[in-house]
Swiss-Prot record:
GO terms for molecular function: ATP binding; tRNA binding; tRNA dimethylallyltransferase activity; zinc ion binding. ATP binds at residues 21-28. Pfam families: IPPT. [MOD+] is the prion form of MOD5. [MOD+] is the result of a conformational change of the cellular MOD5 protein that becomes self-propagating and infectious. This conformational change generates a form of MOD5 that assembles into amyloid-like fibrillar aggregates. [MOD+]-aggregates sequester soluble MOD5, resulting in decreased levels of (i(6)A)-modified tRNAs and higher ergosterol levels, due to less competition for ERG20, which uses the same substrate DMAPP than MOD5. [MOD+] can be cured by GdnHCl and by deletion of the molecular chaperone HSP104, which is required for [MOD+] propagation. Present with 2020 molecules/cell in log phase SD medium. It catalyses: adenosine(37) in tRNA + dimethylallyl diphosphate = N(6)-dimethylallyladenosine(37) in tRNA + diphosphate. Its EC number is 2.5.1.75. It comes from Saccharomyces cerevisiae (strain ATCC 204508 / S288c) (Baker's yeast). Keywords: Amyloid, ATP-binding, Cytoplasm, Metal-binding, Mitochondrion, Nucleotide-binding, Nucleus, Prion, Transferase, tRNA processing, Zinc, Zinc-finger. Dimethylallyl diphosphate binds at residues 23-28. The record marks 112, 193 as: Interaction with substrate tRNA. Residues 210-232 are annotated as: Interaction with isopentenylpyrophosphate transferase. This is tRNA dimethylallyltransferase.
Length: 428
């Protein structure tokens, strides 16, 4: 079991509650219950719910179910705009400060979990003490040869260099740029800032086991269609057609909403056999929703939990008939201790779900494994030996079809060379 709260936040007197979890698990419902109990207001952290209108396909919590609780950073971005994480950070910080100023508790809720990473984890500040780069430094940073940049980083900060593949050009370049601009090794900076939060933050993870969750998600898609989701998708398509968008332009912005791209072939009628069944589009929407939920769980376990050193409380929303006991009352008890500055008496996770946090602990240990493994058998397209970072990826490489094929080829070549030598000796 993971122990110990996350230390080092910048403002211990100001509280923030974060509710993480997959789509359709009940985050909005829980946020209303906590807001009512603790005089809170909700801040949306879902990248699709920031867009105006289309409340059904973006799954905005219905106004009539919000119990008068104010919601911030929601329903304010035009469809023509792309919404970036730096804008979310600005808007979310403004909302948090406003809510705190009025003596209330901000409750951050949403499915775009990387927003939480951007908001709560302190990042490297290169501007406060930024140095002017020399011509030589600029030449190195602008080099198109990954080896030049990587080898320079190895000399300047070997610890941070081990965390990146030599061909990970952009990240290696960024680390070297930080070193040049601050005069400080990025590895030292990251170690100092790794567990710093901007506020005293309680992380709650609302979780449901996959099978019942997926059934609820399928049912939700059916319910959305009954409530008018198809009309909203057609509304989006009308805007899409009027502005002459193409499918290739639908990788960003409002077009990422689940439902639009799944129904686009049906709306355009453009397929190989010119026939698209509405039922197939509905099934694709359900499939993509389930896939999205899987990615969200993976992100929480592999990114969020390691970032906050396991300082998170898991709530079981698997059985909705037990919602009040397993989710609502447990969340209220945890939040009450947190807000009152008392030690939290509740366990991090119910016994049946402890393994989820244990896996997060394993991930944290694995994240510290930055050993470089060089394969003497396999080479990249540029002729260099393949490099794997960390034991996990080394084992994956060793078990890959590519490695096994190269190993067999080398063995056959070695056997052939041995045969030639033996034959030559026999003849002589």
């Amino acid at each position: 079991m993971l122990k110990g709260p996350l230390k080092g936040c910048l403002n211990m007197s100001k509280k923030v509650i974060v509710i993480a979890g997959t789509t359709g698990v009940g985050k909005s419902q829980l946020s209303i219950q906590l807001a009512q109990k603790f005089n809170g207001e909700v801040i949306n952290s879902d990248s699709m719910q920031v867009y105006k209108d289309i409340p059904i396909i973006t799954n905005k919590h219905p106004l009539q179910e919000r119990e008068g609780i104010p919601h911030h950073v929601m329903n304010h971005v035009d469809w023509s705009e792309e919404y970036y994480s730096h804008r979310f950070e600005t808007e979310c910080m403004n909302a948090i400060e406003d809510i705190h100023r009025r003596g209330k508790i901000p409750i951050v809720v949403g499915g775009t979990h990387y927003y939480l990473q951007t908001l709560f984890n302190k990042r490297v500040d290169t501007k406060s003490s930024e140095r002017k780069l020399t011509r030589k430094q600029l030449d190195i940073l602008e080099s198109t040869d990954p080896d030049v940049i990587y080898n320079t980083l190895v000399k300047c900060d070997p610890d941070i260099a081990t965390k990146y593949h030599p061909n990970d050009y952009r990240r290696v370049q960024r680390m070297l740029e930080i070193y040049y601009k601050t005069g400080k090794k990025p590895s030292e900076t990251f170690n100092e800032q790794k567990i710093t939060l901007k506020f005293d933050t309680l992380f709650l993870w609302l979780y449901s086991k996959p099978e019942p969750l997926f059934q609820r998600l399928d049912d939700r898609v059916d319910d959305m269609l009954e409530r008018g989701a198809l009309q909203e998708i057609k509304q989006l398509y009308e805007y899409y057609s009027q502005n002459k968008f193409t499918p290739e332009q639908c990788e960003n912005g409002v077009w990422q909403v689940i439902g639009f791209k799944e129904f686009l072939p049906w709306l355009t009628g453009k397929t190989d056999d010119n026939t698209v069944k509405l039922e197939d589009c509905i099934e694709r929407m359900k499939t993509r929703t389930r896939q999205y939920a899987k990615r969200q769980v993976k992100w929480i376990k592999k990114m969020l939990i390691p970032d906050i050193k396991g300082d998170i409380y898991l709530l079981d929303a698997t059985d909705l008939s037990q919602w009040d006991t397993n989710a609502s009352q447990r969340a209220i008890a945890i939040s009450n201790d947190f807000i009152s500055n008392r030690p939290i008496k509740q366990e991090r996770a119910p016994k049946a779900l402890e393994e989820l946090l244990s896996k997060g602990e394993t991930t944290m240990k694995k994240l510290d494994d930055w050993t470089h493994y060089t394969c003497n058998v396999c080479r990249n397209a540029d002729g260099k030996n393949v490099v794997a970072i960390g034991e996990k990826y080394w084992k994956i490489h060793l078990g890959s079809r590519r490695h096994k094929s190269n190993l067999k080829r080398n063995t056959r070549q070695a056997d052939f060379e041995k045969w030639k030598i033996n034959k030559k000796e026999t003849v002589e």
